[in-house]
Structure formats: structure tokens, C-alpha cells
Amino acid sequence: MKLASLLAAQWRALVLSTGFLTRLAPARAATDAEMAAGVAHYPLVGLLAGLVCAGPFLLGLLAGHPWVQALGYAALLLWATRGLHWDGWADLMDAWGSSATGDRFWDILKDSRIGAFGVLGIVFGVLGQVVLAHEVITLGRAGALVWAPVLGRAACVVLAACVPPGTRSTLGRLTSAGATHMTVLFCAGVTAATGVALAGPPAVLAAALPCACAVVWLTALARREGGLNGDFLGACIIQGELSALLGTILA
């Protein structure tokens, strides 16, 4: 009976996380404790998103047209995630690119309007994703397209574990609360196992360096500004995804 209750709770946490991070499950109301518990499932949500977005091309859709496949993959990821993480990426590029600090940094970060640095970040980020995906497909290692969202979401959990949430963001607080040592170890294990299976051990090792650099940079920036919010987490997911694709090419 206890096992059944545990499995039911974990299933609910997975569904809640899927609905929060993607449109692949219905969005549902959740308590703070449920949101925190769902953090452990972020890499699994990434795996589901990767399968949905890369699966058609792995099965041969648009075979022989790697540029179109790469663009389709990026477009499907945008659709599946509602552009949620790219929004955080753009906001962070605006705030960081302005060289602002303190309250001014947070004012820019939370401004719903996009600035020049945000536009540049989106253009070069999406362009980079398409180019890297094209190279991965051309190398015949398209399994890495499935793995990239896994690494991105695991990186987000590591970032949340490294930075005190501060008082500026409910999402930052809840994610940090869920990013316990055991959760980080579980996410790392899931990410390593899926990476070895889908991209190969050399790609996992090669992706670790740029991903670690991204987490270290975001950690330093968040600590300087007194905490993190959802924009930091979204930007970390994007950087983790790009790191997975880059690592696969370099391996």
C-alpha cells in the first residue's frame, strides 16, 4: 500500500512538472510542496520533450534534408515549451547586457518588453540551436537531439541547488527548495544514463565542460544580484541544451 501511494505521488509530480514546463500535459494547480517535489522529474520531462520533438526526424521525416529537420526540431521545441525558456533567456540577456546591477538589474529582468540585447540573444541562440542540430543530424548522431532537453533541465536543477533563492521570486524559491542533494544526484544519474544511451559517453564528457561553465557563470551572476528567479532557470535550460549539441559535435 505504501509503495502504491509513493508511486502515485511520484506520478502526480511528474505530470505536474510536465504541465508546468511544457504543453505536453495539462497545466494543473499545485501546492508549494508539490511544485518542489516535481523538481526531481525535470530531466524526465526533458526526455519526453526530446522524444516528441526529435522523434519524427529519428523515424525518417524529411530524411535527406538536415537543415529542414534542424529547423523543425527547434520549432517543435519552441512549441512544446511555449517558448518559456527562451523568454527567460531574452530577459537575462537584456539585464546582463545592460551592465546594470542591484534594483536596476531586476527592473530590466522583470520588464515584459524586450530590448536590443534580448533580441540579439534570441537571434543568436535560436540560430545556434538550428546550426548545432544540423551538424548533429549530419554526423548521424540525432539521438543527441533527444538528450539535449534532458541536460538542459538537469543543469537548471544544479543551478537551483547552487544559489540561495532570495526573496524576489516564488519560482526560484520553490525550485531551490526541491533541488536537494538527493535530487541533484538523481537528476545527474538520469542525465548521464540517457546521455550515454542516446549520444554516447564521449558526447556526455564533452558536453559537461560548456554546461558546467554556464552553470558557474549563472551562479556567480545570481549570487551577485542576491538570488535567482525563473528567468535564470530558463536561461540555464537553454544553455544546457546548446551544450549537449555542442558536446556531441566535439566528441
Swiss-Prot record:
Transmembrane segments: 44-64, 114-134, 143-163, 177-197, 198-218
Domain of life, source organism: Bacteria
Pfam hit, one: CobS
Entry EC no(s): 2.7.8.26
Cofactor(s) it depends on: Mg(2+)
GO BP terms in the entry: cobalamin biosynthetic process
Membrane topology: Multi-pass membrane protein
GO cellular component, one term: plasma membrane
Family annotation (InterPro entries): CobS (IPR003805)
GO MF, any single term: adenosylcobinamide-GDP ribazoletransferase activity
Biological or metabolic pathway of the protein: Cofactor biosynthesis; adenosylcobalamin biosynthesis; adenosylcobalamin from cob(II)yrinate a,c-diamide: step 7/7
Compartment list: Cell inner membrane
Catalyzed reactions: alpha-ribazole + adenosylcob(III)inamide-GDP = adenosylcob(III)alamin + GMP + H(+); alpha-ribazole 5'-phosphate + adenosylcob(III)inamide-GDP = adenosylcob(III)alamin 5'-phosphate + GMP + H(+)
Record has tRNA processing as a keyword: no
Keywords: Cell inner membrane, Cell membrane, Cobalamin biosynthesis, Magnesium, Membrane, Transferase, Transmembrane, Transmembrane helix
Main location class: membrane
UniProt record similarity statement: Belongs to the CobS family.
Function: Joins adenosylcobinamide-GDP and alpha-ribazole to generate adenosylcobalamin (Ado-cobalamin). Also synthesizes adenosylcobalamin 5'-phosphate from adenosylcobinamide-GDP and alpha-ribazole 5'-phosphate.
Name this polypeptide is given: Adenosylcobinamide-GDP ribazoletransferase
